[in-house]
UniProtKB/Swiss-Prot annotation:
Sequence repeats lie at residues 178-185, 186-193, 218-225, 226-233, 240-247, 248-255, 274-281, 287-294, 295-302, 303-310, 311-318, 353-359. It comes from Mycobacterium tuberculosis (strain ATCC 25618 / H37Rv). The gene is rpfA. Residues 142-253, 271-371 are annotated as: Disordered. This is Resuscitation-promoting factor RpfA. Residues 160-170, 194-210, 274-292 have a biased composition (Low complexity). GO terms for molecular function: hydrolase activity. Might be a good vaccine candidate.
Amino acid sequence: MSGRHRKPTTSNVSVAKIAFTGAVLGGGGIAMAAQATAATDGEWDQVARCESGGNWSINTGNGYLGGLQFTQSTWAAHGGGEFAPSAQLASREQQIAVGERVLATQGRGAWPVCGRGLSNATPREVLPASAAMDAPLDAAAVNGEPAPLAPPPADPAPPVELAANDLPAPLGEPLPAAPADPAPPADLAPPAPADVAPPVELAVNDLPAPLGEPLPAAPADPAPPADLAPPAPADLAPPAPADLAPPAPADLAPPVELAVNDLPAPLGEPLPAAPAELAPPADLAPASADLAPPAPADLAPPAPAELAPPAPADLAPPAAVNEQTAPGDQPATAPGGPVGLATDLELPEPDPQPADAPPPGDVTEAPAETPQVSNIAYTKKLWQAIRAQDVCGNDALDSLAQPYVIG
């Protein structure tokens, strides 16, 4: 057999099968490789979350619009105008389609930070422009769905027609005049006039005073009737004689005169000074310096009756005020006694001492021929004794004011 018709060997058939199988597998691998490098929707969502927080309708006012942050010039240069005037007004799919075109022309450098995970660019089929315009302007997941529009209002009810009696009177038209009273028939008698009550006349006191006018003067006192008796003259009652009251009898007890020390001090005037001790009269010779002071009554020796001064005795208690005698009725004082003192106030004579009683040895006997002058202290003691007995009277005071001389 010639070589052209020779039956192919098994080795050649195996080579051909291997070549065919490799071609089939190689073509499928190439197709699978091209499919694996295309950018997916998840990759674009990752870019949108990185660029705008996943808000596909964002417009921050910085010149970058939409979820992939397109500029207006990039959006218009890559055919975005066929979907919407600007990127934030287009839908997510429309923005991804324009993003595929930008990725094909500029690569991942169009998004320097967020575009590192993108694969190769692949053309996308997008919705028509009319469907894109009907898409919501904002993402429902971020801003929520807008509230539905209110339903259109129902047809208004027809106006109610009021009846003629219910219609309000037109404004501006005068009311009709009241009908005039018909004239009475000529044959009827005129009505009797009604009794008109006379006007009530108020009294003068009941009338109100006119405003702005002075009040009327009070009416004068009416004249008394002629038949009344005239008033009694004022001089009918005789004045009481001045000498009707009899004078007080002269023998009435005079008012009690208080002593100088007992009288209350006058208001506003200084108190009287205490009476100083009276000096002895100038015509009397002073007592000798060697004379001893008078001894007490129980120690003094018997002295001559004409020289020894009477010892002060217990004074009688003063008489009552109604029992005192008037100054004119007082009895005369005893001779040699104080002037002005009553006899009942005279000092009693001292008891006689026995003649044989020897004088005490420590008492010096005054010579009989030398007159004794009473000490001023004796008068003072006498005055104190009188005051102790509540004796009052100007005559007694005057008598005490004069020194008493024994001799």
